[in-house]
Structure formats: C-alpha cells, structure tokens
Amino acid sequence: MSQYPLPFHKDSTGHIRPLGLVQPLMGSILPTGDFAVPIVPESQWQEFDLTTEPGYPLVVKDQNGKGACNGHATAEAMELARWIHGQPHVPLSGWFPYAILCGGWDRGSSIGEALALIEKTGLAPETQVPYGTINPTRLSKDAYDVATNFKCEVGIPLESWEQIMSAVQLRMGGVNVSIRVSNGVWTIDDEGIVPVSRGQGNHAICIGHGVKRLKSGGWAIKWQNSWSGQWGDKGYAWYTKDHWETQTLREAWVIRTPMENPRDDSNPPVIS
C-alpha cells in the first residue's frame, strides 16, 4: 500500500501534505436551517486585516502529514469566531474532530460533516488531545466533556461568493471553505495568492481574517492554512472568487454564533 493513500502535494518547504478534503458521495450534506447571510453589496465592501489587530491570538496550526485539513480548518474557524465575538482565546484541537470523522483511518473528511459535528459534539482544547491523534478510541471522556463548552450554536451553509464575502464583511465568524490544490507549484505570488486550478475542492481552509482589493480590481479574503507558519506568508494567503467558482465540487459554512461557555465569566453581556 502506498505510504500516502490520499492525494498529496509536496509544498515549497519540502513537506508532503495529504489533501484530506473529500466530497460526500450523494452531494453536500451541509445542514440547513432558518438562518441566512444578509448580502452586503460590493459597493460597501471594505478592506481590513484582523491579523494586525492588537491582541490577535490565533497561531497557525500544522496537520503534520495527515489528511486532517478539515479538522484543523474547523478548529481555526471556531477560534476565529470566538475571538470576533469577544470570547477568550482557547487553542482548539484540529485532531479531535478529524479523529471522530475519519474513524481512525487517515482518509479525509467533508466540510459538511464537520459542521454537524461541532453543532452536536463541539471541539476539545489542544490541551485535551495529544498532537497527531487520529484514533477516536484515544480521545478521553474529559476531552468529550470539555468539548461541549466549544460548540457551534448557529452555523450557516454558504453557497455563493457573495454569501462568503458578506459573511466575512459582517465579521460573522470563521469560515471553513474548500479550495483546489493544483498538481504543480502551489506557492503564493506577490499578492499572496496561490494558483487557481479547476477540479473538485481537495483542501479545507479557514478564511475570514481580512479582505483586500487586488491590483486587478477584484477582491480577496485572507485565509489561514494548516501547513505551519513556514508556508505562504507566515501561514497565510488570500482567497479569490476564482478559487471558489472554478471548483467543480465545493462546500463552505460560517460559524455565525459560537456557544457561550456557562463556566466562563468573561463572556460578553447579552444585549436585549
């Protein structure tokens, strides 16, 4: 058997990066609900960069040669959502959701499955899950118990570039979105953008950290990879409309409301 049963990409740092985003056999399994994203007209889009804000706490993760991109993008999206919503930063494990979703077999997972998981089970902090865990039987009861404090109360599927950009412009929360990693060189250009290639999304990333106008006049959203801070611009790059629309199969969701932890007295007050 091949050492890498998943498709993989050898990045610019020389590391093998399995591409662990898989699409559901019967199409998207993203849950549906009564919430929607208000569309922000392009004339009102604004540039910003959360990573330059004082106290920005997120650290780029590293899936370390496993197909755990979706688990890590999910954890990053929750960390970003909690910070945007004024909740204290807690580093969350990307291995916790991946171990549950892959069942101990490094076969990848889908974005829709991840949203259903964090709505039902939540996410465990990094302190509760040994790094590199993909066997769910090695997840402790304590990890599951603590994970209930880090659930997604409201998650919204995103189906268009306009919905994605609107969610980001409104600072709704972290967005887990698919992207296509090409077979060739996949490094950023002078604007921080990776090459666009056609095909189904095979990598999951967290976006929503910023927005900028490109030289072409188009727009791009800042995203955080999970290939360590050695990749890209200290682990970051920029996502464009072409990255989204050239995918033949794609998925995305935003964490609209991270659940408030009743044991945490630093939650922001509820405004009636």
Task: Indicate residue ranges for each PLM-predicted region.
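Acidic helix-start/capping segments at beta-turn-to-alpha-helix junctions
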Residues: 89-103
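Predominantly the structural core of cysteine protease catalytic domains
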Residues: 2-5, 10, 75-79, 101-272
